[in-house]
Amino acid sequence: MASASATATLLKPNLPPHKPTIIASSVSPPLPPPRRNHLLRRDFLSLAATSTLLTQSIQFLAPAPVSAAEDEEYIKDTSAVISKVRSTLSMQKTDPNVADAVAELREASNSWVAKYRKEKALLGKASFRDIYSALNAVSGHYVSFGPTAPIPAKRKARILEEMETAEKALTRGR
């Protein structure tokens, strides 16, 4: 086979340079870029952060007023629970009314806890903390060992001490 050696030549057209045609009839100013109708992530995050800060700072600016009637009711209910705990703990284990007294105490303590556990204003009070702890210890003992089982001396002393400190805190408004 005979090979033909051919060289490729590039053809370059000789055209005049292209000049854009300018129409001078009516030229309007350039249009502004189109408006965004969607939020960017940074816009959303800054909006979310601002709203979070505002909602949390509103609580400090205008705290909810606690009425004196609610405070008096808390003091009255708490004092009643304290006296019921003391009277139940002071009963002799041979007393035939121990089981009924324990049932009344559990009912009173459950209603007290259900009523005041939701109150955020009371959660930081020393009286609430001490009463709640003592009621938890008493209820836990009677649930575990039955209503006629006597509370051990050490646990009883701790419960009565918590009752005393809670009573002192109540008189001080804490």
Swiss-Prot record:
Disruption phenotype: Plants grow slightly slower and are slightly smaller than wild-type. Somewhat photoinhibited, in strong light the amount of D1 (psbA) protein decreased faster than wild-type and thus levels of PSII are decreased.
Keyword annotations of the record: Chloroplast, Membrane, Phosphoprotein, Plastid, Thylakoid, Transit peptide
Principal cellular location given in the protein's record: plastid
Region (Disordered): 1-35
Disulphide connectivity of cysteines: none
GO cellular component, one term: chloroplast thylakoid membrane
Membrane-topology annotation of the record: Peripheral membrane protein
A Pfam short name: PSII_Pbs27
Localization, UniProt: Plastid, Chloroplast thylakoid membrane
Annotated function: Probably involved in repair of photodamaged photosystem II (PSII).
Protein name in the entry: Photosystem II repair protein PSB27-H1, chloroplastic
Record organism: Arabidopsis thaliana
Gene that produces this protein: PSB27-1
